[in-house]
Structures are given as structure tokens and as C-alpha cells.
A protein has these predicted regions:
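Compositionally biased low-complexity segments enriched in polar/charged residues
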Residues: 1-4
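C-terminal alpha-helical interaction modules of replication/initiation AAA+ assemblies
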Residues: 11-23, 27, 32, 49-167
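Amphipathic alpha-helical repeat scaffolds
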Residues: 35-40, 55
Length: 167
């Protein structure tokens, strides 16, 4: 079994069900605000803030939703800036998927119990820390917008610059 539970003093005990966290988080924040703030913190490289908001997400049972968003974030924002990260995420993704498959989907507390899984916590915090520290490049930010006139032969000729230097 993939559930490695932690010391009882670090365990989150709460009687609320997963349905209680559809729109608001464990502490009563709006779900969309928490998730957007988490990714803004990652964008700005604020590790402590990102870890705080990640904790809020994990306590609220958003474990697998956040995991998918972190993978997409890596593909869209970091990708070639940290080429070793994709292999690291692949290995961690296998562990996360095995844990997800081991959860009884009919159990009312199954997904919420992931917040008390030591492996899941460690994987998430290490990935978020790495994402915070990685260089980021937004897709398409650095590329100029092209117009139809940019493809006219005359405009192309004007842009060619060739200096002839004879040795």
C-alpha cells in the first residue's frame, strides 16, 4: 500500500467531507483565489508564500488537481529553462499516480487522506520549491506580432542587411 502516514502530531484531523471544499478551502478562502495566488507566488519565486498556499490546497483535498496544474505550469512556463526537471517530474508523477490508483474512490475520505501522506507532502513541497527557483519564460512573450504586409517581397528586401567586407 502506498499510504505512509506520518507522526500523529503532524496529521490533519478534520471531519468535513470533500464536498465541503468545492468552492472554499480548509481555512475558508475562495478556491480560485488560493490557486491563482499559489501560481503567482511560484511565478515570483516566493518559496515561503508558495508553500503556505500549497499547504492550504493540500489540506483542502485539491491534491490531484494541483498536481496536474503544476505539470502544465512546468510545460508552459519553465520547460527548456530547466531540462532536468521533466525527468524528475516524470518519476514523481509515477509515484503520485500509484497513490491515486490505490485510493478507494467510493471512500468518502480517500482523497482527503492524501493530505496526511508523507510521500505526497514531500513530493509537492520539493516540486513547488524547484518551480519557484527555476527560470521562467512565458510562451509567446518574446515573439513579435506579424502582419500580412511583413510577407510582401518589397518589405522583405528592405529588411535584408548585408555588409560586404573584402579581406
Amino acid at each position: 500500500l502506498f499510504f505512509v502516514f506520518m507522526d500523529s502530531k503532524y496529521t490533519i484531523v478534520d471531519s468535513r467531507l470533500l464536498e465541503s471544499f468545492k468552492k472554499s478551502t480548509f481555512s475558508g478562502y475562495k478556491k480560485t483565489d488560493v490557486i491563482s495566488t499559489l501560481f503567482k507566488s511560484i511565478d515570483n519565486g516566493k518559496i515561503e508564500n508558495a508553500c503556505n498556499w500549497l499547504t492550504e490546497c493540500l489540506c483542502s483535498g485539491y491534491t490531484f488537481d494541483i498536481w496536474q496544474r503544476l505539470l502544465i505550469y512546468n510545460c508552459n512556463t519553465i520547460s527548456i529553462n530547466n531540462p532536468n526537471l521533466i525527468l524528475y517530474l516524470y518519476k514523481k508523477n509515477k509515484i503520485i499516480n500509484n497513490i491515486y490508483r490505490s485510493i478507494d474512490k467510493n471512500d468518502r475520505y480517500g482523497i482527503l487522506e492524501c493530505r496526511n501522506n508523507d510521500k505526497i507532502r514531500n513530493i509537492f513541497f520539493s516540486v513547488v520549491t524547484i518551480l519557484c527557483m527555476s527560470n521562467k519564460t512565458k510562451k509567446y512573450d518574446k515573439y513579435p506580432k506579424l502582419k500580412d504586409t511583413d510577407f510582401d517581397f518589397e518589405n522583405i528586401q528592405k529588411r535584408f542587411v548585408a555588409n560586404v567586407y573584402l579581406l
